[in-house]
């Protein structure tokens, strides 16, 4: 090792020692000759090689580890369920008998007899009798009797049912509306020329009906219900009436709505003997017959939409009335209801209107003590706006309260015909009558055997031409009860109360 090398090593050692003694952060300059030596590097020869991207398939197997879960068995106590077993089809009886008895020796009897259940056809017979021996004090004999019999037959086809009905009804009433004093009874006994209908009246009604109704399962088809009813009606005095009524109800489902159309053709021919007196109550020499003929044609289109909670129906009534003179009538119709709390409360409101036929048959069925030939005039229910609330207080108690205001043009009112033989018959007059009505109905089901019901109607009337709403009650009250013994023996009791009516 030469002197230069030794000197360099010494300087390096001194420099390192000085740095250790004095710390870092100072600069030193070393002068000398530095000869770096580079060692020869041994490099590996690596070149890129292509790798096949298609990997070989390796079989994969899944093994389930057998593990047994320990689930202890536990039995819970269950409450016994109460099942109501209902037969698939309710048992039908071929016969049904109804009997009753009321005040003034008033027996009632009804008989129903039919074929019971059949897939092909159905037929039945109905007979009814109701009469009274009378007994009202200080007036004339008040006996009456109502008798009726009707039979029906219906044939079931694939998509329709076709049926017919024959009817006969006979009613007898007594004109008892006079004071039965000794002088009046003596006058009646000594009068020779007394007409047969002076103290009594008979009404005979012979009719038949036919019906064709569709039974489509597809609601998109036009469902139809067409009916024809004809009545030949007459009384003891010789008045006669023939009425033919054709009706058709059409409906079709369309995009969630129900489109409907009602058709009415009502033809009426009425003939009676002309008589003298204020209302035609005095029989005299033959004055000939007086005829009243007319045809009523009506259309009632409607559209109905029903949801889970609501029901809405909007429509109209259009009529052409050709009785005496031809007139056109239009009435709006609408109804809406909404269910609250799962049908516990259902508020509803609506408006109605229609043209009504007042026939000899309809008037004398409402008041059989009319004169021999009452005058006929059709009525118009201009409007009937109503609203109410129905629902259930509980599973046993149901109710319905309602308020309405209506007006009827040419409403029939019944007044006394003063010039009759005994002054005991009634005549009909027509007037515009407005009605404000409040009504309430309640029903109570004690159990499956006993049920009670009651209804009250309070009405306030307003007339145009007549001073009073003759023979219209200011209130009506009805209460009743029903007792059913296994649907084999049913006993009913009902009482009706009417407010004092003004007699004209």
Q: In which residue ranges do the predicted regions lie?
A:
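Outer-membrane beta-barrel translocator/receptor signature
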Residues: 78-79, 88-137, 141-149
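Exposed, low-structure sequence patches enriched in small/polar residues
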Residues: 92, 97-100, 311-313, 319-323, ...
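Residues on the lipid-exposed face of transmembrane beta-strands in outer-membrane beta-barrel proteins
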Residues: 111-115, 125, 151-155, 208-214, ...
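Flexible loop and strand-edge segments within Gram-negative outer membrane beta-barrel domains
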Residues: 132-144, 165-223, 227-243
């Amino acid at each position: 090792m030469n002197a230069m090398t030794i000197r360099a090593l010494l300087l390096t050692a001194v420099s390192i020692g000085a740095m250790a003694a004095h710390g870092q952060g100072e600069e030193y300059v070393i002068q000398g000759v530095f000869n770096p030596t580079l060692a020869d590097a041994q490099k590996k020869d690596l070149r890129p090689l292509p790798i096949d991207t298609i990997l070989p398939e390796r079989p994969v197997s899944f093994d389930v580890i057998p593990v047994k879960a320990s689930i202890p068995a536990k039995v819970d106590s269950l409450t016994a369920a109460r099942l109501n077993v209902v037969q698939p089809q309710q048992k039908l009886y071929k016969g049904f008998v109804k009997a009753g008895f009321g005040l003034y020796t008033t027996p009632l009897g009804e008989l129903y007899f039919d074929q019971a259940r059949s897939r092909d056809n159905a037929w039945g017979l109905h007979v009814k009798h109701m009469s009274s021996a009378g007994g009202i004090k200080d007036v004339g004999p008040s006996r009456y009797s109502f008798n009726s019999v009707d039979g029906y037959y219906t044939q079931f086809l694939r998509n329709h049912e076709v049926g017919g009905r024959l009817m006969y009804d006979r009613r007898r009433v007594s004109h008892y509306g006079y004071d039965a004093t000794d002088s009046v009874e003596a006058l009646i006994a000594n009068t020779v020329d007394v007409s047969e209908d002076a103290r009594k009246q008979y009404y005979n009604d012979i009719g038949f009906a036919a019906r064709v109704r569709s039974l489509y399962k597809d609601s998109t088809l036009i469902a139809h219900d067409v009916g024809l009813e004809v009545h030949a009606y007459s009384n003891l005095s010789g008045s006669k009436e023939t009425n033919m009524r054709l009706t058709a109800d059409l409906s079709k489902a369309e995009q969630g709505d129900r489109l409907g159309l009602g058709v009415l053709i009502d033809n009426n021919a009425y003939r009676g003997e002309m008589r003298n007196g204020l209302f035609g109550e005095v029989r005299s020499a033959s004055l000939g017959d007086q005829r009243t003929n007319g045809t009523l044609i009506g259309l009632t289109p409607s559209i109905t939409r029903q949801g889970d909670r609501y029901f809405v129906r909007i429509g109209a009534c259009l009529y052409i009335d050709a009785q005496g003179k031809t007139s056109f009538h239009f009435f709006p119709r609408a109804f809406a209801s909404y269910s609250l709390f799962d049908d516990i409360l259902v508020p509803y409101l609506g408006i109605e209107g229609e043209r009504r036929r007042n026939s000899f048959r309809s008037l004398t069925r409402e008041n059989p003590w009319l004169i021999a030939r009452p005058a006929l005039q059709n009525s118009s229910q201009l409007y009937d706006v109503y609203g109410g609330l129905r629902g259930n207080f509980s599973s046993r108690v149901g109710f319905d309260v309602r308020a309405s205001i209506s007006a009827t043009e040419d409403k029939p009112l019944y007044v006394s015909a003063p010039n009759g033989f005994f002054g005991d018959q009634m005549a009909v007059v027509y007037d515009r009558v407005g009605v404000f009505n409040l009504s309430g109905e309640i029903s109570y089901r004690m159990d499956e055997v006993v049920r009670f019901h009651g209804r009250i109607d309070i009405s306030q009337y307003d007339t145009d031409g007549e001073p009073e709403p003759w023979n219209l009650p200011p209130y009506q009250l009805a209460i009743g009860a029903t007792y059913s013994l296994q649907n084999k023996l049913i006993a009913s009791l009902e009482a009706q109360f009417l407010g004092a009516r003004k007699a004209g």
